[in-house]
Amino acid sequence: MEVLNLKNIGVRGVNSALHDVPEDRKENFEILNPQGQHSIACGINAPLNVKVKGHVGFYCGGMNKHAKIIIYGHAGVGVGENMMSGYIHVKGDTSESAGATAHGGLLVIEGNTSSRCGISMK
């Protein structure tokens, strides 16, 4: 399992590492110290397993294709926004618009969610 410390490499570094994996490879990643940063693990287009250890900000896992993302904390606005396939599991609560424009995949929220959850799913 590759460990990505967001505090050290930033959101761009984390997302670049996730995007650099070829579409046909399945790898495991653990993201540490998300500290409520926005746009973590967005645009993944490979069957990755991603564990985010902590709370995330807006749009975590947005535009997901194929990846399994587990968030061990709460998520801000728009988690799983425009998800095409894959799986996102939030172990805490989410803000509004969770999975609002998802076209596929599965979004699981163990806690509570706010308004507009799945409002425009296809």
Stretches with model-predicted labels:
Residues 1-122:
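Long, distal/terminal scaffolding or interaction modules
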